[in-house]
């Protein structure tokens, strides 16, 4: 009986969270599906839009800067990232796959990544998005020990991996 209670106590939050992951809504402007709320990469292929094909194409062709990646790999310890993005957004279609490519090559623990997909008003009910003061997407927010280190808003000023390295060097 104790085992059943223990397993229920552990599994119930996971089940509840997973039911709120990769939720779909209709983009009223383009009349197609978009992701809304907490998401992960698996959600990209579940919506009826061109986000997944754009994601896959950009991920495949993007080449990271090896020297910067070596530097960046030394700065990831204790880092958490919140990504606020939109599957309807052209900049998200370009920069989100590049971000994932960088993090994949660095073997970043994706459990330390929170992805929030927003609507055209930059809202995502049931998430922390409202408290993040995001006006443009994608916005990459980097934390260490719950302290915000910096953001990349919409488009990096240099290579994405270089901007991340600058932020994590603080």
Q: What are the functions of these language-model segments?
A:
Residues 17-75, 165-170:
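Non-globular targeting/processing and membrane-anchoring segments
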Residues 81-87, 110-124:
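Thiol-based oxidoreductase modules, predominantly thioredoxin-like and allied folds used
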Residues 101-107, 130-134:
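Short, surface-exposed basic-aromatic patches at helix termini and helix-loop junctions that form
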Residues 94-97, 127, 162:
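Generic recognition of short, well-ordered alpha-helical segments
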Residues 1-23:
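Bacterial Sec-dependent N-terminal signal peptides
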Residues 73-105:
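Local sequence-structure signature of Cys/Sec-based thiol-disulfide redox active-site neighborhoods
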Residues 136, 141-170:
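Non-catalytic, surface beta->alpha helical segment in thiol-disulfide oxidoreductase systems
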């Amino acid at each position: 009986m104790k085992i059943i209670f223990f397993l229920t106590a552990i599994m119930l939050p996971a089940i509840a969270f997973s039911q709120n992951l990769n939720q779909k809504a209709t983009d009223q402007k383009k009349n197609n599906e978009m992701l809304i709320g907490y998401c992960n990469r698996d959600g990209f292929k579940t919506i009826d839009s061109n986000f997944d094909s754009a994601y896959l194409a950009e991920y495949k062709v993007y080449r990271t800067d090896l020297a910067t990646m070596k530097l960046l790999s030394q700065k990831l310890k204790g880092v958490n990232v919140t990504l606020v993005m939109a599957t309807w957004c052209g900049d998200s279609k370009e920069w989100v796959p590049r971000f994932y490519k960088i993090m994949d090559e660095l073997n970043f623990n994706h459990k330390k990544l929170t992805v929030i997909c927003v609507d055209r008003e930059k809202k995502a009910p049931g998430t922390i998005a409202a408290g993040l003061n995001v006006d443009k997407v994608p916005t990459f927010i980097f934390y260490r020990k719950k302290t915000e280190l910096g953001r990349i808003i919409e488009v990096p000023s240099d290579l994405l991996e270089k901007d991340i390295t600058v932020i994590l060097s603080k």
